[in-house]
Design a protein with these regions (language model features):
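Short, acidic, metal-binding catalytic loop of nucleotide-sugar glycosyltransferases
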Residues: 37-47
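A conserved acidic beta->alpha catalytic loop
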Residues: 54-63, 82, 110-113
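Glycine-rich, basic loop-to-helix element that forms the pyrophosphate-binding segment
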Residues: 79-98, 119
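Short beta-strand-to-loop acidic/aromatic patch adjacent to the donor-nucleotide binding site
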Residues: 100-111
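Conserved donor NDP-sugar-binding/catalytic core segment of glycosyltransferases
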Residues: 114-146
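Catalytic donor/gating beta->alpha subdomain of glycosyltransferases that bind UDP-sugars
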Residues: 124, 192-255
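Short, flexible, basic/aromatic active-site loop/helix in glycosyltransferases
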Residues: 134-140, 148-177, 250
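Membrane-embedded multi-pass helical conduit in multi-pass membrane proteins
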Residues: 264-336
Length: 340
């Protein structure tokens, strides 16, 4: 394969198994059993351990995992007192990472092809990459969730993000985390546990700055099920915005072009409060709303998808929440700097 790393073809660590599967979770009773079932066959074929790292679930998730572990000796449950996903993966590597070449991170809220783990291991071996990331396709069940999936699969919702639109494998600086070699994971200090959101992008920045390489594969992908209500979607993207701001502030990097436009949304919406003084204050927010709803209508016509119009509204929720979260974190940082 063209463009492979100089790690390609190197022997494995002595006595180390290829990979361990790490599933961070919190209150995922509705999904955890199917996710474990999905990866169990691969775990058997590749001799992998499955670690469910639970952040204190109260909905029966732990009991489900415990019952499944009785008949599945590869399955283990770890307690994650810090609750967040970044801490969950770090804990898994701390406890068992020394016995494995790499970790495969699985989202409890997602779905995966039956050969997902095999393809990741093959790609890591073929390219010599230090991390393999995948494309993410979003699907939904209810009306709002389906509309959100349509939005997230479009440029309106993902801004043309590389790991949303993959036709050919290539080297990249970021993607949806799938496989990471344990050695480089430890070398850069693992995930920053001060990040409750966007820990993957922050990690990828440190990984690539340290000279490690990330391969975006087209050989497999994962399916993600978005939040099913306006409130939960807004809360999620508020966290994403704050995480992105923290990443930029920590590393003093300039936001990418596709991130600059959503940054204007919260100020534009806030500016509508000046409409009593001048009606022109409505124009920026009005143009943004018209663009989103119009794009949703275009999706409905072009793709013959009845969820298109509502997808425009879902995109508005995501844009506004992300922008508000970003500015909230930025202003909080300025206040902390002023006090210091």
């Amino acid at each position: 394969m063209a463009g492979t790393s100089d790690r390609a073809g190197k022997p494995r660590m002595p006595n180390a198994k290829p990979s361990m599967i790490v599933i961070p979770c919190l209150d995922e009773a509705g999904h955890i059993a199917s996710v474990i079932d999905r990866v169990s066959s691969s775990a058997e074929r590749l001799d992998m351990t499955i670690l469910v790292v639970d952040g204190g679930s109260r909905d029966g998730t732990r009991e489900i995992v415990g019952e499944m572990a009785v008949s599945n000796p590869r399955l283990h449950l770890l307690d994650n007192e810090k609750k967040i996903q970044s801490a969950a993966v770090n804990l898994a590597v701390e406890k068992l990472g020394g016995g494995f070449e790499s970790l495969i991170r699985i989202d409890a809220h997602g779905d995966y092809p039956d050969d997902y783990c095999e393809r990741l291991v093959e790609e890591a071996d073929a390219t010599g990459a230090d991390a393999v990331v995948v494309a993410m396709e979003t699907r939904g069940a209810g009306v709002f969730q389906r509309a959100t999936a349509v939005a997230q699969n479009s440029r309106l919702g993902n801004g043309g993000s590389a790991h949303r639109l993959v036709s050919k494998g290539r080297w990249t600086d970021h993607g949806h985390h799938a496989l990471i070699r344990v050695e480089p994971f430890r070398a850069v200090g693992g995930y920053d546990e001060s990040f409750s959101h966007n820990e993957d992008a922050e990690f990828d920045y440190r990984l690539t700055e340290a000279g490690y390489r990330i391969w975006l594969t087209e050989k497999t992908h994962m399916v993600y099920y978005p939040r099913a209500s306006v409130t939960s979607l807004f809360r999620q993207y508020l966290g994403y915005g704050r995480g992105r701001a923290r990443n930029i502030l920590k590393h003093r990097v300039v936001p990418k072009g596709r991130q600059m436009i959503p940054l204007l949304v919260a100020p534009a919406v806030a500016g509508t409060s000046l409409a009593l003084l001048n009606w022109a204050a409505l124009l920026p927010a009005g143009m943004w709303a018209a663009l989103c709803l119009g794009y949703g209508g275009w999706i409905a016509i072009r793709q013959r998808d009845p969820h298109g119009p509502l997808a425009g509204f879902s995109a508005m929720v995501m844009h506004l929440a992300w922008s508000a979260g970003f500015w909230r974190e930025l202003l909080a940082f300025r206040r902390r700097e002023t006090r210091a």
